[in-house]
Amino acid sequence: MGGALIVLAMPKTIQFIKSAVLEKDFPVHKKAEVAIAGRSNAGKSSFINALTKNKIAKVSSTPGKTRLLNFFELDQSYVMVDMPGYGFAARSGDEMREWHRMIETYLMNREQLRGLLLVMDIRRSWTEDEELLKEFSERRGFPLAVVLTKADKMSRSQMLQAVAKVKKASGLSAVFGVSALKKEGQDAVEDYIYENWIKE
């Protein structure tokens, strides 16, 4: 390959598999899974729709709307798992504990998991919530990449500074700035997923 940029076609087919909360209800298959997590209102649904070029994730003005793990098969190649948003203050203590149990069960036990995309609003700082998900990845040994959404809210120089700031705070090298509005940055994320997590 010689380090050449690989331009990958977007998924041709997208099939909703199922929604689940309990491990016993997770779908049975042998494909690689890529999970996508993010703070409520981080722009996760808009990012997923831009990445797949399909409206598979419901965009809501109400944070914390997604309460289930939603499984989608992309181009018969891998399975994307849309995880419930975290950090929504209006949720009760019981709901937060339920969220934590569901996320921990999936991240720590799912054999098909190949990597986690952590979606953040580019204007927010790295917090203890993000650090917790990083700890899950380190304990289990799966890779973690960060997607900074709403990059159109900044100039390019500000976006690069924000990316550098998150890289430093997180200790991660795979940090991407994207804009669903301008349809920028998603291809780089897709290339990264295929090259590092999906390709045999």
From Swiss-Prot:
Belongs to the TRAFAC class TrmE-Era-EngA-EngB-Septin-like GTPase superfamily. EngB GTPase family. Necessary for normal cell division and for the maintenance of normal septation. One of its GO terms (biological process) is division septum assembly. GO terms for molecular function: GTP binding; metal ion binding. Keywords: Cell cycle, Cell division, GTP-binding, Magnesium, Metal-binding, Nucleotide-binding, Septation. GTP binds at residues 38-45, 64-68, 82-85, 149-152, 178-180. Residues 30-199 form the EngB-type G domain. Its cofactor is Mg(2+). One of its GO terms (cellular component) is cytosol. It holds the Pfam family MMR_HSR1. This is Probable GTP-binding protein EngB. The gene is engB. Mg(2+) binds at residues 45, 66. CDD domains: YihA_EngB (cd01876). The lineage of its organism: Bacteria, Pseudomonadati, Bdellovibrionota, Bdellovibrionia, Bdellovibrionales. It comes from the Bacteria. SUPFAM superfamilies: P-loop containing nucleoside triphosphate hydrolases. HAMAP family: GTPase_EngB (MF_00321). Disulfide bonds: none annotated.
